[in-house]
């Protein structure tokens, strides 16, 4: 349900940081993130323009969550931003912040990716920085759903798996097992 006070509070935060694309935001003692329709300026060859990326992300998050709860919950949508519930820490930080959780978190991320794929869906770039681990609930949430560029004529789920494993090695995840 629409929350006018939340929208007003989000607009204040955005006005204080007019050029930031992603902003942490606390409202009624709950953590959220505001994601705006602003280019991050990286890899323009491989990424869509900011408006298409925004529309793609909102659509994919809603599509995924209508089937399996593996994307952040969007609680407010505006014409050029949305507010989503915070989902934990990125997997790339888990080794340092919760080393005792590292194996479980990575394993559950793999299970979650397989579950997503079992619904015929794909993420587009499941790098460890785009996968959140909630230390308390032990839940996995995939972030950053705006990537939808196709360079290869392969099943997008295969590319997801390749990028997930590649990210494991790129981040230097400890241990010699997957």
Segments from the language model and where they lie:
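Conserved structural core of kinase catalytic domains
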Residues: 38, 50-54, 58, 62-65, ...
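Conserved hydrophobic alpha-helix
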Residues: 64, 112-116
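Catalytic-loop of the protein kinase fold
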Residues: 118-130
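Conserved protein kinase catalytic core
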Residues: 41, 91, 150
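ATP-binding glycine-rich loop module of kinase domains
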Residues: 7-55
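C-lobe/activation-segment region of protein kinase-like
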Residues: 134-135, 141-178
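Active-site beta-strand termini and strand-to-loop segments that position acidic
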Residues: 24-30, 85-86, 134-135
């Amino acid at each position: 349900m629409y929350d006018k006070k939340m929208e007003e509070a989000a607009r204040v935060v955005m006005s204080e940081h007019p050029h930031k694309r992603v902003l942490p935001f606390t409202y009624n003692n709950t953590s959220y993130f505001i994601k705006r329709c602003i280019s991050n300026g990286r890899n323009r060859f491989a990424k869509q323009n900011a408006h298409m990326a925004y529309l793609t992300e909102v659509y994919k998050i809603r599509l995924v969550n209508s089937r399996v709860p593996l994307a952040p919950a969007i609680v407010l949508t505006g014409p050029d931003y949305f507010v989503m519930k915070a989902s934990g820490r990125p997997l790339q930080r888990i080794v340092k912040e919760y080393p005792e959780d590292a194996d479980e978190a990575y394993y559950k991320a793999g299970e979650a990716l397989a579950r997503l794929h079992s619904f015929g869906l794909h993420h587009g770039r499941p790098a460890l920085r785009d996968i959140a681990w909630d230390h308390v609930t032990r839940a996995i949430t995939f972030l950053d759903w705006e990537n939808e560029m196709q360079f290869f004529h392969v099943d997008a789920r295969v590319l997801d798996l390749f990028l997930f494993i590649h990210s494991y090695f790129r981040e230097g995840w400890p241990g010699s097992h997957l």
